[in-house]
Design a protein with these regions (language model features):
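Alpha-helix initiation and N-capping motif
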Residues: 197-200, 314-318, 338-341, 392, ...
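N-terminal targeting leaders characterized by basic, low-complexity, disordered sequences
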Residues: 1-54
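Membrane-interface segments at or immediately adjacent to transmembrane helices
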Residues: 282-370
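Serine-centered coil/turn micro-motif
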Residues: 47, 54, 290, 312, ...
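A diffuse structural propensity rather than consistent per-protein peaks
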Residues: 181-196, 334-337, 493, 513, ...
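Solvent-exposed soluble domains appended to multi-pass membrane proteins
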Residues: 356-359, 372-373, 378-750
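Short hydrophobic "helix-edge" motifs at membrane interfaces and signal-peptide entry regions
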Residues: 135, 363-365, 594-596
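Transmembrane and membrane-interface helices of multi-pass
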Residues: 38-308
Length: 750
């Protein structure tokens, strides 16, 4: 049995030998894999222990421990140091930004200028005066800019809660602003304004470096180097400063104890208050009568909205920038909505269609020249002024043969751009909020596609359908950028490229003559095969009214019982008006020789600010706001010799000019022009009158009837009130609303 058993069950050794001989592959064991994987963490731990026990790692651990101990013992910077550093950095930022507005003066003959004058006129001298005027003139605009930038600094400190990081960021932001401002002033004689930020948000930020001129590159490079070192220093100070946070704050355990709760609440309150203060100041600075407006005025702020560069130079670029950041346009009408605007558009479309059926011509059949004649008005209409010679006999004669009358102006001695804006857009300053003082600076920069009447010619003839001339500097009232938005192909000015061609002066006048201005218009008319809209803003009669002209007959013709100083200004002004009168007559005669239909809309924007005696009398309020205007067509026009009824055209405001011109020309109108025509028939003139001389139009609203009498709003007819409400709805939609009318054909002439 044993033998049999041995034969059947070979020994393990024999079996193993036999299997080896047959080369059967071994099957992997799962238990072996698990065993190997369990060894890996042990091996890693063993190797890590060996590594950490090595001499270099022991030394590194000791160094880290030493640094940790050192950092735990680092001193906390006192809050007084923060205050001192903030004051120094803030003051430096104000000076750097203000420096960006100045440039070293050049002299035709340096030897003829004394050293003291050179010192005061230098950049250092101007900066010194900007600060020293606090003591010399009690003007605290430097302090105002210091406090405003301090608000920005505080916001960064409380939001980031890291003093030195906030200091670095504040320095970077203000330095970039100062350098960019300096470059823009050099290139365009215009500071950085809020609308410039749209260039960045539109995705063009990468192109900014292409605008840096070569001579500004050292400034850019030097500023970058300074900021790099300043950032390194600030980060090092943040590391060294034992006060990690300006205000103790804990995210993960906000309610750990009373101290933590107090710290967290303090931080939140500080952020909310600082942001709210800066936001409220910025939001209200441009609103006349607001708390920030009054506070800024008390510190010497004097808004100079006619020129952003002058405003920034005098009041500081920071204040000038924030002033334009927000302006209250107008309150939303209660019934403003899409349905209301669609119904309104439909109503005036039907009315325009009925009007157009009776009219034979189109506006674009003629070239229309809109002339804003600077400060043009009749001196003999001013109470107390007595001249023995008529300073404007040609225009007086013309007014008897063509559409003409008196225009109600919102300004005296200023506000040119407001009257111009009304004439080009049909919008009324009186319907805007009273805090809106200059739409060219406070409204248009924030609009994407503002509507203006020159676009009627652009629709007919493309980009070259309209052109503008202004024989002065292009950035006055931001005309250069605004005219581009309006669709003018070019604004020719003294500093445009190319510059306005004809720049002749009369005698010692510092301004281009009206004759030269008119010649630029004539050249444009003669060089174009198609009609166009031409905008001209003259300069000949701009203040000051010094003794510029030879042979001034009005020195003898003035028999007014006024002071010698006032009479002298009036006499010089009257001489300029008499020259404009003759130059305008010559211009119209030249247009009569042109074999193309041309219609001229001519108006004075406001009376000069020379009539101090007459302005003091409140009974003269209306007459001091009335200037002459006329609408005239040359012999080649179908409307030559047309004179609208004085009941229609005797008293107007500039927002109605294009509607009146269409009526004068018997031209078809858009629904928008139809609405303006109807409003003008019920309310011939509407204007926000100024409250003081040399003001912009920040007083009460005046409504005139066809005889020029002032009418209270409550006494307007029911129809007039309805039309005024329609006007308000349309103006809101065009300036601040949803733009429902843009896609509704409301501005198209069909």
């Amino acid at each position: 049995m044993n033998d049999i058993q041995n034969d059947q069950e070979p020994s393990a050794q024999e079996s193993g030998t036999d299997m080896g001989k047959t080369e059967v592959p071994a099957v992997p064991s799962k238990q072996n894999d698990d065993h190997q994987s369990n060894k890996l963490p042990l091996l890693f731990a063993l190797n890590f222990s060996i590594l950490m026990a090595s001499k270099p790692m022991v030394m590194l651990a000791k160094a880290i421990s030493f640094l940790h101990t050192l950092l735990k013992k680092r001193p906390r910077c006192p809050y007084t140091l923060y205050v001192v550093v903030m004051a120094m950095v803030d003051a430096a930022a104000v000076l750097f930004i203000q420096w960006s507005m100045y440039e070293e003066p050049t002299y035709a003959d340096p030897d003829a200028v004394d050293g003291t004058t050179k010192m005061f006129n230098s950049v250092a001298g101007q900066l010194t005066k900007f600060v020293a005027q606090m003591w010399m003139e009690h003007n605290y605009v430097w302090l105002l800019n210091f406090l405003v930038l301090g608000m920005v600094y505080l916001v960064l400190v409380f939001v980031l809660n890291r003093f030195w990081v906030a200091t670095a960021l504040f320095s970077i932001l203000t330095s970039i602003y100062a350098v960019a401002n300096s470059i823009k002033v050099d290139l365009r004689n215009e500071p950085i304004i809020p609308s410039d930020l749209g260039f960045l948000s539109s995705g063009n930020g990468g192109e900014i470096t292409s605008f840096i001129p070569k001579d500004s590159q050292p400034l850019v490079n030097g500023t970058i180097t300074m900021l790099i070192w300043l950032t390194i220093i600030c980060l090092a100070l943040q590391l060294i400063d034992g006060r990690r946070c300006v205000i103790p704050f804990h995210w993960w355990h906000p309610f750990r104890n009373v101290k933590t709760i107090i710290g967290n609440c303090t931080r939140i309150i500080a952020v909310v208050l600082s942001v709210s203060l800066l936001w409220s100041f910025t939001w209200n600075l441009g609103i006349n009568g607001s708390w920030s407006y009054k506070w800024a005025k008390s510190l010497g702020d004097n808004p100079l909205l006619w020129s952003t560069v002058v405003d920034a130079t005098y009041n500081g670029p920071t204040v000038g920038f924030l002033r334009l950041a927000h302006a209250k346009t107008m309150d939303k009408p209660k019934d403003y909505n899409k349905e209301t605007m669609e119904a309104l558009a439909k109503r005036y479309k039907e009315s325009a269609q009925a009007t157009n059926e009776a009219r034979a011509n189109n506006l674009t059949d003629s070239t229309v020249v809109m002339i804003l004649s600077e400060s043009f008005s009749d001196p003999t209409r001013v109470p107390g002024v007595e001249l023995t010679e008529d300073p404007m006999p040609n225009i007086h004669a013309l007014e008897g043969t063509t559409t003409s009358g008196l225009m109600l102006s919102p300004g005296i001695g200023g506000g040119t751009a407001n009257i111009e804006h009304q004439a080009l857009t049909g919008l009324s300053l009186a319907l805007f909020d009273n805090s809106m003082q200059s739409p060219y600076q406070e409204l248009v920069p924030h609009q994407k596609t503002p509507y203006t009447f020159n676009q009627i010619w652009n629709d007919a003839y493309g980009k070259n359908g309209s052109v503008a001339f202004h024989p002065y500097f292009k950035n006055m009232y931001l005309r250069d950028s605004n005219y581009k938005k309006f669709g003018f192909s070019k604004l020719y000015s003294l500093d445009s490229d190319p510059a306005i061609e004809h720049q002749d002066h009369i005698d010692s006048s510092p301004y281009v003559s009206d004759a030269a201005s008119y010649q630029n218009v004539l050249d444009s008319i003669n060089s174009n095969d198609h009609t166009q809209f031409i905008q001209l803003v003259t300069m000949q009669n701009h203040a000051p009214y010094n003794d510029f002209y030879a042979d001034n007959q009005f020195k003898e013709a003035d028999v007014s019982q006024l002071s010698d100083e006032e009479k002298q200004s009036i006499d010089n002004y009257a001489k300029g008006i008499s020259l404009t009168d003759q130059e305008t007559a010559d211009f119209l005669n030249q247009l009569n020789a042109v074999d193309k239909p041309v219609t001229v809309i001519f108006y004075g924007d406001h009376l000069p600010g020379t009539y101090s005696t007459a302005t003091k009398d409140k009974n003269n309020t209306l007459v001091m706001h009335e200037t002459d205007y006329f609408i005239w067509s040359n012999q080649a026009s179908a409307s030559a010799g047309v004179k609208l009824d004085p009941q229609t055209a005797g008293y107007v405001s500039s927002n109605y000019f294009m509607a009146l011109a269409a009526e004068h020309m018997n031209a078809k109108v858009s629904p928008y022009l139809e609405m303006l025509t109807q409003v003008q028939a019920q309310i011939p003139a509407i204007s926000r009158l100024i409250s003081s001389n040399d003001s912009w139009g920040d007083g009460s609203t005046a409504y005139l009837d066809a005889e020029g009498n002032r009418v209270k709003r409550k006494d307007l007819s029911k129809e007039a009130k309805q039309l005024l409400n329609d006007y308000r709805l349309v103006q809101y939609d065009m300036s601040k609303g949803k733009g429902y009318l843009n896609d509704d054909g409301f501005f198209a002439v069909k």
